[in-house]
Structure formats: C-alpha cells, structure tokens
Amino acid sequence: MATSALYACTKCNQRFPFEELSQGQQLCKECRIAHPIVKCTYCRSEFQQESKTNTICKKCAQNVKQFGTPKPCQYCNIIAAFIGTKCQRCTNSEKKYGPPQTCEQCKQQCAFDRKDEGRRKVDGKLLCWLCTLSYRRVLQKTKEQRKGLGSSHSNSSSLSEKEHQRHHHHHQHHRHGSSHHKISGNLSPEQDQGLWKQSIQKETPKKKPKLETKPSNGDSSSITQSMDSGGTDNFILISQLKEEVMSLKRMLQQRDQTILEKDRKLTELKADFQYQESNMRVKMNNMEKAHKEAMEQQQAKNRELLKQVAALSKGKKFDRSGSSLLLP
C-alpha cells in the first residue's frame, strides 16, 4: 500500500499531509494558531502576525518610524495617510483611474472606477477597497461551505449505495431518482438566488450547487441542506453586522475629525482675541502715559508762567515806589 506524500509547513518545516496545510500560506494547524492572519491597524491589509503584540504590518511599521503616526485618509478614512492627507493606496488609484466616486455599498466617496477590469470581479458593482474585500470574503466562505456540503453529500451517497447494493437495479434507481427530486425541491433556484441576495453585495450565483446533481438519501440531504442554509444565513448576518460596524467607525472618525477641526478653529479664534486684547491694553497704557506726560508738561509751563507773572508784578510795584520817592 503506497503512503501519501507529505508536505513541509512554511513556518516550522515539519511535514504533514497536504489536506492539513492551509491554502496560500501552507501552514500547519499549530502555526496557524500561533501566527494567525490579522488585519493591520492602520492600512487594514491582512498579514501574518509574528507576535500577539504586533498589530501593524511591516510596511506600516517602517512608515511609522520614518514619518510618525498616520492621519485618516480624506477619501477612505483609513488611518494610513503618512504623507499629506491621502493614503498611498488612494494616491496611486487616483493617479491611475482618476478622482474617486461614490461606493455603492458604504456610500463613501472612495471608490475608483477600474472600468471592465475591476467590475468583472465584483459582479459589475462600483465598490471601494474595503467593500470589495468583504464581497470576496462572502463569496469565498459560501464556496467553501458548498464544497464541504458536496463532499459530505457524496460520502453519504456512497454509504447508501453500499447498503442497498443487494436490491434490484430498478428499485435502487427509483430510490435515487426520488432522492434527487427531494433535494431539488428543497433548494429551488429561486430560493438559492434569494439567499445570495441577502448578502452584502446582492450577488446572484450563475451555477447551481453541486447537491442538485448528486443523488443520496432524501432525509440526510434535507437535514444537511437545512443546516447549510442556516449557516449561510448566519454568516451573511455576521458579515452585514461587521460592515455596519465598519461604516459606523468611519462615521465616528469623520465626526471626530470634524470636532478636531472645530476645536482647532476655536483655539485660533481665542488666541487671536487674546492677542488683540493685549494689543489694545498696550495701546491704552501708552495713551495714558502720553496723556500724563502732556498734563505734567502743561502744569510745569503754567507754574513757570505764574512765576513770571508774579515776578513782573513785583517789579512794577518796586518801580512805582522808587519813582514816588524821587519826586519833590
């Protein structure tokens, strides 16, 4: 019996079966727990966390050392504007695709029209970067759930075939046909389309799920399908709540930015008022000093004139008395 091939984990270099390694990063279960994929606090891009205290990616860490703490971008409100008022992603997109437009999901002025190139990936919608990532996550999760349901459905089909292999071929074909009819009745194309419309981006699937084409026992397929439908509904609800939280955070950031701007203007007005008030006080003090000096000068002149008048009056009296003595 041939042994299955083993593949090395990219982190610890230990060998595991291919099914136990993660897609893309090729990490084992222990490394996925020790180094999870998280979002950067600043640029919101996903990166592999080296330590629990590391919350920003390497690129943002270098930018923080070089430029300091970033500011919210004036377009997407992501705290990643290290240089100027726009983040690097919006700056590059604006140079390549022109000014931003309104996102059809979050209604923010931060979506760049990539023409047919980007709209094909999001079902023809004009979405910003964050809403595009959320849209792709919903699609990926739904595809994974449908793949898991299809594999479990095929396993149950093989078991039912082994149990009923002693029955007549016509009877077995009749049971599989009835089971296939039950599955198709449980999940009609209209219900499947309505389930997708509940997602954030209202995506409509172009292909029917695999469980419509594979026969199995009717009871087990209906139970598994109801569980999958409930799980999909819960995931869509969680995704909607997450998007609402993100939009509320953006609104809070905008309000905080508005409040900070108003506080800055109020501080400038107060400083200007204090400066003008101090200037007026200085002018008043100078005017008072000048007035006092002028009054003192006038009073000194008056005193001098009074002295001169008194001296002149005394001289006239002396002259009169002398002339009276000289007369016979």
From Swiss-Prot:
Residues 148-159 have a biased composition (Low complexity). Residues 203-213 have a biased composition (Basic and acidic residues). Highly expressed in hematopoietic and immune systems including in the thymus, spleen, kidney, and blood vessel. Keywords: Coiled coil, Phosphoprotein. InterPro entries: FAM76. Residues 143-232 are annotated as: Disordered. Residues 165-183 have a biased composition (Basic residues). Residues 237-316 form a coiled coil. The modification Phosphoserine is found at S188. GO terms for cellular component: nuclear speck. Disruption phenotype: Increased mortality and impaired thymus development. No effect on blood vessel development but hbbe1 expression in 48 hpf embryos is lower than in wild-type embryos with recovery by 60 hpf, suggesting impaired early erythrocytic development. Significantly increased numbers of neutrophils and macrophages in an inflammatory injury model. Residues 185-201, 216-232 have a biased composition (Polar residues). Signal peptide: none annotated. It holds the Pfam family FAM76. Belongs to the FAM76 family. Plays a role in hematopoiesis and immune system development, and participates in the inflammatory response. This is Protein FAM76B.
